[in-house]
């Protein structure tokens, strides 16, 4: 099963889904961030990851919502207010939400790569909703990228093909046809409509990207803002770019991206440098090598002619005697 599934036991509880797939070789970033915007009401959310046979290693990201990170995550101005010591965020269309921490001790199910979140209605001291929505954001640190990224080996044996490779990102959400029959029927029968499903693919700036969907946007990830969010510490961060696709008013989504990337390693460079040096030496000595080869062939030809003449004379002499 190479599709993620996100469902709720209360219809209409989930408003938006956010998926950020980080795939940067230069920065050694390979994981998935998930954001769920749901109603501030009692419900149970279930997230099922593509089968990998391991328990999800989840990191809560609510503590990262400081400084300019909220603006960077939503790529828009975010207004933050405090109500009864609870931070309330306001984004587009006056949508207000509170940030809810992810409790991995009670939310992760060891079997089937499943994550469960029990949402409880949060009221203020006057029994009034603090905000209409709640937002969960967490990271799957050990997400198996091979479930959504297909490496394509080139059949070309050309010299240029040794420097680059191709991969296809096939990211699917609630794709019923990839599920077992019983599970797919459950998904279809409880199908809900999400206002928006966002998918962002973060990768190195030197990768050449092709997208099947023309309705996408690109964005250069701001320097210095993301370091703490990505847990980079004092490591130098190489530039990255984000490709943003989205599906509106749908229960499922299929995002397809094809990219070509540089796969040259130090071993490749040393081998190629050696080949270039050998070719340069051969090219530099080619005239002398050609003269030597011509002289060798000429001497062999003369020797062959002498040998033939000798055999011919010997044959005639034997015939006369």
Named regions from a protein language model:
Residues 1-132:
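N-terminal pre-first-transmembrane soluble regions of secretory-pathway and organelle membrane proteins
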Residues 5, 16-20, 29-35, 44-48, ...:
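Ordered hydrophobic segments in well-structured contexts
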Residues 38-40, 51-53, 140-144, 203-205, ...:
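Beta-strand elements of well-folded, non-transmembrane domains
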Residues 91-160, 234-248:
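A surface-exposed beta-strand-loop module
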Residues 120-220:
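Surface-exposed, acidic/Ser/Thr-rich flexible loop segments
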Residues 228-279:
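Cytosolic-side membrane-insertion boundary helix
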Residues 262-321:
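Hydrophobic, helix-forming membrane-interacting segments
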